[in-house]
Structure formats: C-alpha cells, structure tokens
C-alpha cells in the first residue's frame, strides 16, 4: 500500500468521546466547538445559524433570491420599516419538514443499498472461505502425496545407486573375464607353439623311423641272405665231409665257424640297435600321447571357461534386462511425478489466485476505509475552513459596515470569482487524486510483474538444475561408453593377434602341403605309411580346426555382443535425442504456458482496471453528489451572508424592533429544532459510509446526547463572540499555512509529471515486450517447421501447438481490443 496523502487537521480538534470505536473501522473525529470561545460569541453564532434556516432553500422554493433582492431594495429605500426585513426571508415549517422527510427517506434507501452490498460481500466472503478451506485440504492431501512421491524418488535413487554399484561390479567382473581370456589366449598361443614344435619333432622322428625301418628291412634281408648262406655252407660242409678228407674239413669248418661268429656278432649288434630304436620310438610315442592328453585337458579347461563366460554373459543380459525394467519403472515414476507436480502447480495457481482475490478484497476494504477517513477529514477541514471564512467575513463586514452599501456588487462579483477558483482547485485536487490512484495501480502492476519475474526465475533455476542433472547422467553414460569402447579396442587387438596366429598356422599348413608334395614324389611303398601318418596329422588338424572354429564362434559371439552394444548405444543416443527433443518441446510448452499465464494475468489486470474504472465512475457520481451538496452549502452561505446583512440592519434598528424580538425568539426556537434535525442528518451521512445497521442505534443515542450538548452550546455561543478576536489573529497564521500547502501542492504536481514520464517509459517497455513475444512466436514457427521434417509422429503435437498459437493470436487481438478500450476510457476520463 502506498502512503495516503495526509490532510491537515486542526490542532484543537479532539476526537469525540461518545462515539464508539469499531476494531475494523477508523475512529470518526467529532467537531466540537473551540474551547477558547466565550459564551457570548457562541450565542451569537447560534443566533446567526438559526437565522440561516429562516430563508427558503433554492431547490424547494425558487423565489428565494428575488425575495432577498426585494428586501434589500426595501431596506435601502425605507430604512424605518422593520416588517419588510423579517417577512421576506421567512420559510414555512411544513416545507422544511417535507424536505427533511424526503432527505431521511433518501438516506434510508442508501442505507438499505449499503446493507445489501454488505450482505453480498459477507456471502462472497463465506464462499471464499469455504473455497479456501477446500483448497487448503486439497493442498494438504497433495503435500502428503508429494511426500510419498519424494520418498519413492529417494528409494528409486537408492535403487539406481545400487544398480550403478551392480554395474560397476559387473564391469569389474567383465574386466577380470577379459584378463582371464587374455591369459587363456596367451596359453593358447604357447600351446600352439608347442604343437608346432611337436609336429616338427614328430616329422623328424617319422623320418628317422622311416630310415630305421628301411635299415631294418635291409638288415632283415641281409639276415635272410646270411641265413641262406649259412644253410648253403652247412650243405657244403656236409658235402665236403663226404668228399674231402677230415683235415680239410676241419680247416674249412674253422673258417666257416669264424665267419658264422662274425655274422652272428653283426646280427646281435643290429638286433641291439633295433631294440634301442624301438625303445626311442616308444618313448616318443609316449611323449606324444602325454602331449595329446595335455592338449585335451587344456581344451576341456577352455570349454569350461567358455561355459563360464556364457554364464556371465547370461548374467549380464539378465542384469541389463533388470536395468531396462528398472529404468522403465523410473520413467513411469517420473511421469507420475510430473503429472502430480502439474496438479500441484495447478492447485498452487488456484491458491495464488484465491490469495490475490483475498488481498484485493483486503486492499479494497482498506482503501475504502482510508477513503472514508479522507472524506471525513476533508469534510471536517472544509467545515473548519468554512467557519474560518465565516469569521473572516464577519470581521470584514464589521470593518466595512459603512462601505457595504456601495460595494455590494463588487463583493458579489468577487465571491463568484472565488467560488470559481475554489471549484477549479477542487477539480485539480480530484484530478491529482485520480492520477495518484492510477500511479498506485501502476505500482501494483509493477509489483505483480516483479513477482511473476521472480516465479519465472525460480522455474528457470529448477529447469537448469534438472538440466545439470541430465548433463551429469549423460557424462556418466559417456564414461561408460568410453569404457566399453576401450574394452572393444582390447577385444579388437586380441582378434588381430588371433588373426596373426591364424596366418602363421596357414603358413605352416602351406609348408606342410609343400612338404606333402615333396613326399608324394617319393617312393610308392612309403606312401602307405605316410598316409597313416597323414591321417594322424589330419586328425590333429581337424582338432585344431575345431579349436579354430570354436575361436571363430567366440569371436562371432563377441562381435554380436559388440553389435548389440552398438545397437544399444544407438538406441540410447536415439532416446537421448528424443529426450532432448521432448525437453525442448516441454521448454517451448512451458514458455507458451508462461505467455498464457502472462496474458491471463494481463486480462485479470484489465478486468481489475475495468472494475476500478467502474468504481471510479461510481466515485465520480458520489463526488458529483458531494459537489451538489457543496453547492447547496454555498447557497446557504450566501443566504447566511444576506441574513448577516439583515442582522446588521436590525442592530441599527434594535430600539425600534424590541416588540418583534419576542416573535423572532419563537422563530429562533423553531430554527433551533430544525438545526438539530439538520445536524442529525449530517451525522447520519458521515456515519452511513462506515457503520452498519447495528451501529445506527448507538448513533441515535449519541445524537440525543449531542442535542443536549447543542443546548449547552447555545448558552456558550455568547462566550465564543469574545474569542472571535483571538481567532482572527490565528487566521493569519492559518493563511500562512495555506500558502505552504499551496507550495506542497505544486511539488506534488511536479511529482505527478515525473510519474507520468515513468508511465510512458513503462508503456515503451510493454511495447518492447510485445515485440519480443512476436519474435518468440516467429521462432516457434521455425521450430515447428523443423519438427515436421524430423518426425512424423509429432504431427499431432504440432497441430496442438498451432491451436495454441491461434489462441495466443486471439488473446493478442483481445489484448489490443482491451488496449483500445482502455485508451478510449482514458480519453473519456480526461474529458471528464
């Protein structure tokens, strides 16, 4: 609330002691008589007021002005005729009673209308309280749901942390498996080298065996030849025994025995050599069998490791499936959270709207109270000013009694000029008040704009925090992807090593084939043996090929895993792109919502301004009524002046009018009664704007007490006449204060001009904001075109966006129409 302009109050104006103070209504200052006035002055003042009511009111009797002028002419022409002075300005009591009765009826009607408005406001208040209660209950429920969702979110975050730990454990297991695979590949390389060496040694041994077998065959052939020779020699010996003499036989027998010994020794030596070669062959075969057993054991180990790897892969797949399921649950929970947050936001918006309505009602009530206080203070100040002016005029009349008859026309002209000046001043005051109210409304609008900007900033901070969280998650995903890429690079290096080993094996096979071709060119009898050896080699090669096929299968599985990972990565990238697009769309939708909220707030502001304009028009009507009342008061003042002139004439002719004083005293009593009625009406008018029907009874009691006080004041009026001179001196001081107030008014006018300049600057800013909104709309159109090119599924959302843009355009047209209406209303206000 902006501070209201302070109205100067009289330093000797205490509050009325008999008026009760309501806790929600400001105290009404009572206007008692000045304590420094004497009884004589008070009595003279009462007499003058009583004489004021003797004249006819201009609205009830239009012939009052003519009668007053006729009495003046008669006084000028015949100063000795006292009847003309009293009979012309008399007012019938029946007319006064009718006027008072009509005035009371009008006041009662106004009271009834105010009572109805109060009842309507109380009904609205109860409805708003009920709506507030239900909204608070709903907010509490939503707070409970929000707490549950927050707890679920915390649980989900914990679960996500556990999943990350499980992922890290799986990654470590995968690293261990990779290391174990590397070790196995190294062992496999070593075994392949040993196989290669063993194959080479086998070939060498086979060659040696072939040579030894050839030698054995030669030895056996020689043995058979020797045996044949021995048999022939034995036959020869037998023949020789028969033919030759014994000496020759002995010599030949000795010679043959020696040859047999030598041949038998050679045979034994060859047999021993053959046994050695057989033993060596057996040892080599045993080594080969042992190596084959070792190879089989290693193959079994490799198969077990492959089974373990498969089990780990299955576990990985299961964990990945669990991760996907958990991620889907997380997404569903997040969607539920978004929906509930949207509901909470809607309820918060409703609560804010209700709070705004309450604040507006409270502000209206406070403004009405302040305005009523200001009106009362202004009325009191006006009453005091009028009294001061009356006193000044009385002083001037006393000084200018001798010159009044000559300066009547000039005085009337000056009074008219003063009245016009007063009216102009009052109009300027009303305009300044209207400007001040407009400024207050502008300041309120600024405050609302600041509040909206703060809300927008808070929302942007939330969005930025969410984006930072998303960026952190993306960085984590990228780190995981980098780890996967590193693992894939290691696997590729291993594959390259395998390819190199396979190339070496192929080179060895080519060498074997060349050697086979060389062996095929050899003898035919060796082919059978070689075929047997080749069968063995083919079996070994088949085993090697089976191992290679297993390695190929493992590599294919690894490639498939890599392809699956790549597909998963591509899916993740696509999902991230979709999420980013959805985030962009949500941001755009949030911007559109913010724009719609701004437009709604502007529409509400426009409605409030229209309501305020209606209130201002009502106030203008009330002000016109007040002006009419002031005009009536001025007419009464003119009549009072005429009556004062008559009183002065009567003072000159007091000795002649002593007989008619008694009649005037009777008339004065009637006028006193009428004055009491008028004062009651004035109090009712002042207290009707603030108090309700229940307080009217208290006011009536106070009015009765005031009537008693008025009677006491009639006795003290005479004392007030003595104090008039002292008050004349104070009037000069008050005139100086009036000059100071005029200077303050000029300063206020300068402030008003500055505020008008600020208002123009605000209008420029508003136009700039409208241009920005148009630029944003153009950007939205460009984004929509891009969205048409990117995805066909977003066509429905784009149609919705177009509908929202059409709504925005309609709202802009409505805003423009409202601006045109506001300008027209401002022009009307300026014309008024």
UniProtKB/Swiss-Prot annotation:
Presence of keyword Coiled coil: yes
Domain of life of the native organism: Eukaryota
Basic and acidic residues bias: start-end ranges: 37-58, 92-107, 664-684, 692-832
Compositional bias annotation for Polar residues: 59-69, 77-89
Signal sequence, start to end: none
Coiled-coil residue spans: 163-828
Stretch list, region Disordered: 1-107, 303-333, 351-431, 508-652, 664-832
Keywords in alphabetical order: Coiled coil
Tagged with keyword Transmembrane helix: no
Residue stretches of biased makeup (Basic residues): 13-27
Family: Belongs to the GOLGA6 family.
Name this protein carries in UniProt: Golgin subfamily A member 6-like protein 24
Gene from which this protein is expressed: GOLGA6L24
